[in-house]
């Protein structure tokens, strides 16, 4: 009888420990994500006067994709005449792995004309490790910047999503297909 009680109590103790470690793991995953208030706070100081529009876009992104576990703040320039190019640089911020410099480049093709410069905040979803951001993220983009404003697109690769939110200055109108390639060093080659 003692053996049965000992085995049963050992089993229950094991179940409790497994449950606690699973709860701790879920808690750590949630602690590595950014709340909408944290994102809007970081973006408001970065973008300045467009914070109400930013709050609306962040709200929409969170309702679609949940809480991001990273975000990028940076600047970029683009130009297009049917085919286009985009170049940018910024910093990837994460709660559990620190900050990391990132550069991005990308070609696009479609009905797209003009040029713009933009401050960019990119929400990063399902980032397993900071180095995982260094790849190509593809998507369809539409933009209508008329002397300023905000725009949002979605790019995806390997179960991850990057949601760029841009506040641009310039004149650009179009819709295109393209990708962004993230690199640890700057490069002129968008391919």
Positions of predicted regions on the chain:
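Positively charged n-region of N-terminal signal peptides that target proteins for export
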Residues: 1-4
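Bacterial N-terminal signal peptides
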Residues: 6-16
């Amino acid at each position: 009888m003692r053996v049965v009680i000992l085995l049963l109590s050992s089993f229950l103790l094991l179940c409790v420990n497994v449950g606690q470690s699973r709860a701790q793991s879920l808690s750590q995953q949630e602690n590595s994500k950014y709340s909408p208030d944290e994102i809007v706070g970081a973006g408001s100081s970065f973008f300045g006067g467009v914070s109400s529009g930013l709050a609306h876009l962040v709200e929409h992104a969170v309702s679609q994709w949940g809480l991001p576990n990273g975000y990028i703040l940076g600047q970029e320039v683009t130009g297009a005449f049917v085919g286009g190019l985009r170049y940018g640089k910024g910093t990837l911020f994460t709660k559990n792995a620190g900050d990391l410099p990132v550069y991005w480049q990308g070609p696009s093709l479609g009905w797209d004309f003009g040029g713009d410069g933009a401050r960019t905040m990119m929400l990063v979803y399902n980032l397993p490790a900071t180095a995982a951001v260094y790849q190509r993220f593809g998507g369809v983009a539409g933009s209508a910047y008329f002397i300023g404003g905000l725009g949002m697109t979605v790019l995806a690769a390997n179960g991850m999503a990057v949601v760029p939110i841009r506040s641009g200055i310039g004149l650009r109108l179009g819709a295109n297909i393209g990708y962004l390639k993230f690199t640890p060093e700057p490069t002129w080659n968008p391919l």
